[in-house]
Curated annotation (Swiss-Prot):
Protein's gene: T92
Binding site for Zn(2+): H78, H80, E84, H128
Lineage, uppermost ranks: Eukaryota, Viridiplantae, Streptophyta, Embryophyta, Tracheophyta
A Pfam family matched in the record: Auxin_BP
Gene Ontology cellular component terms for the protein in this record: endoplasmic reticulum lumen
Protein's GO biological process: auxin-activated signaling pathway; cytokinesis by cell plate formation; positive regulation of cell division; positive regulation of cell size; positive regulation of DNA endoreduplication; unidimensional cell growth
Protein name: Auxin-binding protein T92
Amino acid sequence: MARHIIILVAVFWFATAEASHCSINGLPLVRNISELPQENYGRSGLSHTTIAGSVLHGMKEIEVWLQTFAPGFRTPIHRHSCEEIFIVLKGQGTLYLTPSSHSKYPGNPQEFHIFPNSTFHIPVNDVHQVWNTGEQEDLQVLDVISRPPVKVFMYDDWSMPHTAAKLKFPYYWDEECYQTTSRKDEL
């Protein structure tokens, strides 16, 4: 009997280890995104799930996120050396964007209203911020980035010099797994 329990515990432990959230081992090929856990990574008002990613899933060219912003939540003012595409699933908000330029700081951003079924892209190194300006409803987006994992430069405000922006790498949702994942840059 004790031997059966030990075998059962060993099988359970192996299956759990194989399905680690820092690995694709044990994950089904087809998954329901509404059943994937979302976390806020210490950022109240944000729920994030990496649907397919570099650090978590071994993706090399793109990364896909599902993000939900509570009313009033906003991303930091930031830029990154990758392209980014958003698809708004629900809610409304505002995109603030300053095109990449040769000035020393971002300057006054352009404002764009975003809404369900709208899409927008952020060019490489354009400083931007997404804000749920709705009062009642969450803003939910699918977010696709190129060249993962993302290296984010954050600004305190729109007048902060580019050279003073603070690098955040690995980013919040990559921190735990980035340390445990060996990165190979070949096919």
